Amino acid sequence: MAASQTSQTVASHVPFADLCSTLERIQKSKGRAEKIRHFREFLDSWRKFHDAFHKNQKDVTDSFYPAMRLILPQLERERMAYGIKETMLAKLYIELLNLPRDGKDALKLLNYRTPTGTHGDAGDFAMIAYFVLKPRCLQKGSLTIQQVNDLLDSIASNNSAKRKDLIKKSLLQLITQSSALEQKWLIRMIIKDLKLGVSQQTIFSVFHSDAVELHNVTTDLEKVCRQLHDPSVGLSDISITLFSAFKPMLAAIADIEHIEKDMKHQSFYIETKLDGERMQMHKDGDVYKYFSRNGYNYTDQFGASPTEGSLTPFIHNAFKTDIQICILDGEMMAYNPNTQTFMQKGTKFDIKRMVEDSDLQTCYCVFDVLMVNNKKLGHETLRKRYEILSSIFTPIPGRIEIVQKTQAHTKNEVIDALNEAIDKREEGIMIKQPLSIYKPDKRGEGWLKIKPEYVSGLMDELDILIVGGYWGKGSRGGMMSHFLCAVAEKPPPGEKPSVFHTLSRVGSGCTMKELYDLGLKLAKYWKPFHKKAPPSSILCGTEKPEVYIEPCNSVIVQIKAAEIVPSDMYKTGCTLRFPRIEKIRDDKEWHECMTLDDLEQLRGKASGKLASKHFYVGGDDEPQEKKRKAAPKMKKVIGIIEHLKAPNLTNVNKISNIFEDVEFCVMSGTDSQPKPDLENRIAEFGGYIVQNPGPDTYCVIAGSKNIRVKNIILSNKHDVVKPAWLLECFKTKSFVPWQPHFMIHMCPSTKEHFAREYDCYGDSYFVDTDLNQLKEVFSGIKNSNEQTPEEMASLIADLEYRYSWDCSPLSMFRRHTVYLDLYAVINDLSTKNEGTRLAIKALELRFHGAKVVSCLAEGVSHVIIGEDHSRIADFKAFRRTFKRKFKILKESWITDSIDKCELQEENQYLI
């Protein structure tokens, strides 16, 4: 029966190879429009086949879902985890293909992140597997999309059942029935990273105009594909529904200096930013469901009914008797009943997996309500939702509580609240507009957040030593993407440290250029780390690096982090939470790094929190350490860290969608169009703004080449474009194609595209050129004083051949170098015979492309003789001394060739 139902789907008839070839074309396409075209073609063909296949059927549930769940595997919620990552896949491939464990191909798979210099695919396991599998696989697979999904379902369910033997069996079926190209995409689907270069929002928008919004309120791919199968039919009501996970509303990073403006100079709410797990609760009588911010179902942990789970039995009776249905949004926290305090997420527990005999208990801290008794509240103001929230349940301390808020009006009240949060060791504060409505998956639509680490000068920083490294993958393939850092054991007086204890792994905070430069600086010192024979100077916990560096060859990095938390993974017994590299301490020697004693002192200073200063505003004030009167040695500028600042786009009204789903990074503007103006205009046309370019950034806009722009150009990862291109787009209200005069720098793929479309001077091969464009092209051509017209002859001949102009009569002598017998003494220019017919022939030769010379030398191809034959013997004597022999012809060869519009056979005119 199941097989019969399966055969009634489109997916059971569409070859998996067709999907893979489409994905391959999408990935290889440069522009967004071309990527969309390939996806749309596949989608349209699916829909046409679907309509024909189900022509006379009613209530059809078959949809695009089987393909969509493979195209967007990161959004998959129905299928359980595969339990497979790159290393596990490598071991399975080695076993299933019976590869020699120490063989070249096995080592390639196991060490996929280590650069080899062959294909440049370091860090991309799927590509490396492709080259290993290519000689061992079918040319074309036989699996359908339905069969692939069935096998992936089998892998997921057997992983849950811990049946490794059945996992191998399913993988063997995939390997033996699919090509290397198909397996490349299968691997990416299993790892849930397709690297298509196109966002899920773009895929959704092509599928249906309502798809993004429906997915935001359901996080259900199957529901999106089934309800929106017909692109011409929209949904009248797209809103949060009971027992469907929605994407929660998010907060943007706030700039304290602009807080009053961001809140439109009206009163606002301040709440504590809780350090737990964002969770939504759906309730219908005795039935409960819990979903994380990413739509994962945690009902089994927290309880589907009043008789089960770590939370539901304790809160069920807290709800008012008239509350049958509700949807709540809040933070799941771990509560210590002995100390009556909430635990921070960095400590050793996982709220989603707490066991019953734990000393901690689950507490749900609620800050919003989206539905009560079937009444949807998403379009109500936050003030109204708060009023309703207070009437839904009776708070139970340590089990279910309402997040307390205070009403504020000024920046100083925000500063006081932030300083209080620092004193209480809290994560930060939230700022919310009372009139804001709930917008799923939207960031900064009336909600803002402030954490101490967002504000420069409030955090203690650590100077620690790099002792190990990890090869990157994806865009960081082939370079060190993360570093293992350590602190020193305090040495005896007068000596340098010799033993280092690992503390943390860090990789964020660096640009690609900085990572590359740092890796280059240390490149010659890296050594493979052997777990069985580790270096005596570096003591590790369970976290081991892939390569290590002798401390004396390394550098110190300055690290900023939120706090120091316990950890068994590092030798120090603790690690850093949210670490990022601030800078490389070139001013310090390797032995001047932090010691274990320094670390313990810092750890005990504020219960591990690294925010130990208060925020002050005005005059020469600066962040001050709590309970200390001495000012810090170095002044620190107060404000949001520059690269985290985002433009204030709250008052921007969208006027066009030409930049929809396009990400820009504006580095600088022009005098007439400064950076903020360009960013506002981009937002008006539907674009996104980032302050640092990433893998999804379409291009970097630069009005001048400052140091940041030069670094981006050096990285060769991004296209850098003049603001003039943006202004042209704004003027025409269209996505104007790039032209050479718009470009400051082109990444390799763009250069390749332009080479196919334009010549080296920027003139298009295919698009008609107007007068202004031609003037612009000519103005960019540098004058060359070195080349004479004669020296240009070879270049002109090549051009004529390329464009098939070489058959023109005006080009017939182009490749000939001719000496005419115009001189009484050969090569003596003072003996020229004036007024002869040969002088006219010289002009005719030049007109028809020949190079006419006045000196008989190596390289001459023809000598032309007139009526006077007295110097023929001299010419023949000259010819015997030349490596390349020239021909001596009658002048009639020129006349006859011109008269007949083609070169005549030379042998008839030889002398």
Curated annotation (Swiss-Prot):
The active site is at residue 273. It comes from the Eukaryota. It catalyses: ATP + (deoxyribonucleotide)n-3'-hydroxyl + 5'-phospho-(deoxyribonucleotide)m = (deoxyribonucleotide)n+m + AMP + diphosphate. Mg(2+) 2 binds at residue 427. It is found in: Nucleus. One of its GO terms (cellular component) is DNA ligase IV complex. Its cofactor is Mg(2+). It holds the Pfam family DNA_ligase_A_C. GO terms for molecular function: ATP binding; DNA binding; DNA ligase (ATP) activity; metal ion binding. Its main location: nucleus. Keywords: ATP-binding, Cell cycle, Cell division, DNA damage, DNA recombination, DNA repair, Ligase, Magnesium, Metal-binding, Nucleotide-binding, Nucleus, Repeat. ATP binds at residues 271-274, 278, 331, 345, 367, 427, 432, 449, 451. GO terms for biological process: cell division; DNA biosynthetic process; double-strand break repair via classical nonhomologous end joining; immunoglobulin V(D)J recombination; nucleotide-excision repair, DNA gap filling. The keyword Secreted does not apply. InterPro entries: Adenylation_DNA_ligase_IV, BRCT_dom, BRCT_dom_sf, DNA_ligase_ATP-dep, DNA_ligase_ATP-dep_C, DNA_ligase_ATP-dep_cent, DNA_ligase_ATP-dep_CS, DNA_ligase_ATP-dep_N. Mg(2+) 1 binds at residue 331. Residues 654-743, 808-911 form the BRCT domain. Residues 610-620 are annotated as: Required for catalytic activity. Its EC number is 6.5.1.1. DNA ligase involved in DNA non-homologous end joining (NHEJ); required for double-strand break (DSB) repair and V(D)J recombination. Catalyzes the NHEJ ligation step of the broken DNA during DSB repair by resealing the DNA breaks after the gap filling is completed. Joins single-strand breaks in a double-stranded polydeoxynucleotide in an ATP-dependent reaction. LIG4 is mechanistically flexible: it can ligate nicks as well as compatible DNA overhangs alone, while in the presence of XRCC4, it can ligate ends with 2-nucleotides (nt) microhomology and 1-nt gaps. Interacts with XRCC4; the LIG4-XRCC4 subcomplex has a 1:2 stoichiometry and XRCC4 is required for LIG4 stability. Component of the core long-range non-homologous end joining (NHEJ) complex (also named DNA-PK complex) composed of PRKDC, LIG4, XRCC4, XRCC6/Ku70, XRCC5/Ku86 and NHEJ1/XLF. Additional component of the NHEJ complex includes PAXX. Following autophosphorylation, PRKDC dissociates from DNA, leading to formation of the short-range NHEJ complex, composed of LIG4, XRCC4, XRCC6/Ku70, XRCC5/Ku86 and NHEJ1/XLF. Interacts with DCLRE1C; the interaction is direct. Interacts with APLF. Belongs to the ATP-dependent DNA ligase family. This is DNA ligase 4.
